[in-house]
Structures are given as structure tokens and as C-alpha cells.
Regions:
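Class I (Rossmann-like) S-adenosyl-L-methionine-dependent methyltransferase catalytic domain
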Residues: 1-28, 32, 37-88, 108-112, ...
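ABC ATPase nucleotide-binding domain "signature" loop
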Residues: 104
């Protein structure tokens, strides 16, 4: 985890979060950053005036985010050290960000965790996140969750889907390991 945190601590916010923020019609409100890591997305949200609850199972990730948080934003940052499997109930939020995070929820607990996400998101709230597809190099690892296109679209049946893209490419992980990626990027508004 230390290598991942070092590799991502100065990275800019994910483009998917920036796209989602362009869909937000109101003043900044409460955001929940799931699997926040070193805080690249949390820090961007704080800089834009949001109140952020950053959740990660790793204490070092949360410590890194706390160190990087500007003094004038500390009162708007809450840190929660929990795994996805132990995160119920989630705090209410107007925006839930899950950049490259949800695949790390165990498959047997994903449905409950997704229900928790749906319940935590306010009406008209935005979800933005990534899901690994079944052709991802890590597919088959029993502790990770993967989706096919049909199953993923069913998760958002009653939502307004604002952005849905499927990507597949050969690249590297944040720590430089070669990997075949199969990824879905979703931005949706809760009805």
C-alpha cells in the first residue's frame, strides 16, 4: 500500500470526478469518497468547497490524506477507517465518488454494499465510479468484484445515467505493473 500511496499522492483528481462535478447543478454539499487512498479526489472536492467524508480501510492512506489536507479545509474533512464490508451504514451524501475502488469489495458483500451506497445517496445525488469488467487481468481473483455490461446496467436501472463508458486497454497500474484493464466508468443521478 505504501508504494500505491507514494505513486498517487500528488496525482490530480480523476477525470471522471471532474466530469461528474460538471453535472452538479448546485453549490457544493456533502461528498463521500469511497476508497480515498492518498486523497487525490478528496483534496479536489475540498478545494471546490465540498464537505468530504473520506473512507478507506488503510490507516496509512487516511494519515496521508490528513497530512495533505490544507488547514483551511480540515473542518470540512471527516476520515473513516473502515473496509467496504464493514461500512454500513454509510453517511448521507449528495455525491458519492468511488474511483477505482468498488472492485475491491468482496463479491459476497457487494450487493449489500451497493444497497448501502444507494441508501446513502440523497435524492438527485450523483454517483461517480469505476467497475472492473470480466476481461480485466485481475478477473478470477475471488476477493475482487467484476461486472459484465448487462449486470452493471441493471445496477443503475432506476437511475438517470449521465455517462457510461467501457474501456479496455493494456497499460500499467499506479505502481508500474503491466496490466490488461477492462473498466466501466459510470456517472449517474439517483432518481
Amino acid at each position: 500500500m505504501a508504494d500505491f500511496l507514494a505513486a498517487t499522492r500528488d496525482a490530480p483528481a480523476h477525470p471522471s470526478l471532474l466530469r461528474a462535478l460538471n453535472c452538479w447543478p448546485a453549490e457544493p454539499a456533502n461528498a463521500l469518497d469511497l476508497g480515498c487512498g492518498a486523497g487525490r479526489d478528496s483534496l479536489h472536492l475540498l478545494a471546490r468547497g465540498w464537505h468530504v467524508t473520506a473512507l478507506d480501510r488503510d490507516a496509512q492512506a487516511l494519515s496521508t490524506l490528513a497530512l495533505l489536507c490544507p488547514d483551511d479545509a480540515r473542518a470540512r474533512l471527516q476520515l473513516l477507517q473502515r473496509s467496504f464490508e464493514d461500512a454500513d451504514p454509510l453517511p448521507a451524501a449528495h455525491l458519492i465518488n468511488a474511483s477505482f475502488a468498488l472492485p475491491f469489495c468482496s463479491p459476497g458483500r457487494f450487493a449489500d454494499f451497493w444497497r448501502g451506497i444507494s441508501n446513502a445517496l440523497t435524492a438527485e445525488g450523483l454517483f461517480v465510479g469505476h467497475f472492473f469488467g470480466e476481461r480485466d487481468a485481475w478477473a478470477g481473483q475471488r476477493l475482487l468484484t467484476f461486472h459484465d455490461r448487462t449486470a452493471l446496467l441493471q445496477l443503475f436501472d432506476s437511475w438517470e445515467t449521465l455517462h457510461f463508458e467501457e474501456h479496455e486497454w493494456d497499460g500499467k497500474t499506479a505502481v508500474g505493473q503491466r496490466k490488461h484493464w477492462h473498466l466501466f466508468e459510470v456517472i449517474a443521478r439517483r432518481s
